Amino acid sequence: MADDRLIVALDVSTMDAMKSIVSSLGDSVSFYKVGMELFYAEGDQTVRYLQEHGKHVFLDLKLHDIPNTVAHGVSSLTRLGANLITIHGQGGPIMMKAAAEAARESAEKLGIERPKLLTITVLTSFDDESWTSIGGQLPIADQVIRLAKLAKESGMDGVVCSALEAKMIREACGPDFLIVTPGIRPSFAATNDQKRIATPSSALQDGASRLVIGRPITQAEHPQEAVRLIIEEMESVSK
């Protein structure tokens, strides 16, 4: 039985590779993330394929531009039918408010459910040293909280952040704010290139709403068994 708190990242570049993953996981996974690599290579057929197979879609394109451009982009992605869409928090409150309004208006016109908009806080590839090297003045955790509060005030539904900041965001933004966490690594998996990581159970205990996991599942020798072990760990934490 799939647990919709688990989102599997389709970090591949072809439809064939995507279809292979979705087929291999079958009914064990109900939610997938389509990012830049796959969407830029194969376009909206990626989303349509997942929808046709009864899957939810997290479209992680990290929109970041002037408010009008982002608003038009969100309108297009709303028509496409994505369930979750990401917006860069560094674009500021005017941009985020424009995105929220565009999603609401487009969904109303089409008579469909509005996608949830998630603000990107600080990418999980950053550690303190690399963050400082690009001019980050606040500590990472403080910047994440600042952007999360700004996102909520601007009409965003939640954030994407490291699980290490999830507890602070949950306390700052309340029980209904979505917290989606990449950088999740079960005990049997390597950490790869992400610095701020956590296990599935610790992330959920600290307030994460949904977990994004890619390589520990998609590159596993037995992907469905990897999913089973992860869901088993997740279910030890009450929804």
Task: Give each language-model segment a name.
Residues 15-17, 38-53, 66-72, 89-116, ...:
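Active-site-adjacent beta->alpha loops and helix N-cap segments on the catalytic face
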